[in-house]
Design a protein with these regions (language model features):
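Non-catalytic alpha-helical coupling and interface elements of nucleotide-dependent molecular machines
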Residues: 11-12, 16, 45, 54, ...
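Nucleotide phosphate-binding site architecture
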Residues: 33-34, 156, 188
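Charged/polar, solvent-exposed surface patches and flexible loops
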Residues: 9, 13, 118, 132, ...
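Hydrophobic transmembrane alpha-helices and their membrane-interface caps
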Residues: 53-125, 130-136, 142-157, 171, ...
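Loop-to-transmembrane-helix entry motif
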Residues: 29-47, 65, 133-144, 168, ...
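Extracytoplasmic/periplasmic membrane-proximal domains and adjacent transmembrane bundles
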Residues: 1-47, 56-59, 127-128
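Membrane-interface catalytic loops of GT-C/OST-like multi-pass glycosylation enzymes that act
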Residues: 159-164
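Transmembrane alpha-helices and their membrane-interface boundaries in multi-pass membrane transporters
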Residues: 108, 166, 170-196
Length: 196
């Protein structure tokens, strides 16, 4: 926390001035928060590996799984942008929000990518058809994003404790919708040669 950082140097100087045989140890919320944050990040790494395996199995393509994973990484960055926009401090709750957003953000991208793949396998895919598929998918993307953002609005305005999580999630979900509609089709075109 900010208070802990402000007095840390003074505490270290005080430790050095203690007489022989005396020591000073700190404990409390800061240590517990650091331990909890370490546990959640190590758990997230395990689940990240499971997500990769699941995506490769579902999409049957390492490249397409890579596209979806890049969306997750971009959206984690967007959650930190949300903290800046909302003028919130980074902490344990913000970390939980960023990790949760990684899973939530890929949903819209999977919907768009699966619609594109379905159309490509059925009829072949031109750029004009790609635009039609993305426009059709946009309704699903906007609906899921609007309901998710609506669910976080009470936390955004009413809850001080969960406000960092809510800001990160709301900005991340808005960003993930934009990414799903523009980035996913662009990457699909990049990976597959599509006729004009």
């Amino acid at each position: 926390s900010g208070v802990e950082a402000a007095i840390k140097d003074e505490i270290e100087a005080f430790k050095l001035s203690l007489p022989a045989g005396y020591s000073l140890e700190s404990d409390g919320e800061a240590d517990t928060a650091a331990e909890s944050q370490g546990q959640i990040i190590s758990s997230a790494a395990i689940f990240f590996v499971l997500i990769v395996i699941g995506l490769v199995a579902a999409l049957n393509s390492f490249k397409q799984a890579g596209i979806i994973l890049s969306v997750a990484i971009l959206c984690i960055g967007l959650s930190f942008v949300g903290l800046v926009i909302g003028q919130q401090n980074y902490g344990f709750i913000a970390t939980v929000g960023a990790i949760g957003l990684a899973g939530l953000a890929i949903n819209d991208s999977i919907v768009v990518l699966s619609h594109i793949k379905e159309e490509a396998e059925k009829n072949g895919l031109t750029k004009a058809k790609l635009v039609e598929v993305v426009i059709r998918s946009t309704r699903h993307v906007l609906t899921t994003s609007a309901t998710t953002i609506g669910g976080f609005l009470p936390l955004l305005f009413a809850s001080i404790f969960f406000r960092p999580l809510a800001w990160g999630m709301v900005v991340g979900v808005i960003g993930s919708s934009i990414i799903a509609v523009f980035y996913i089709p662009a990457m699909f075109i990049y990976l597959k040669k599509i006729q004009s």
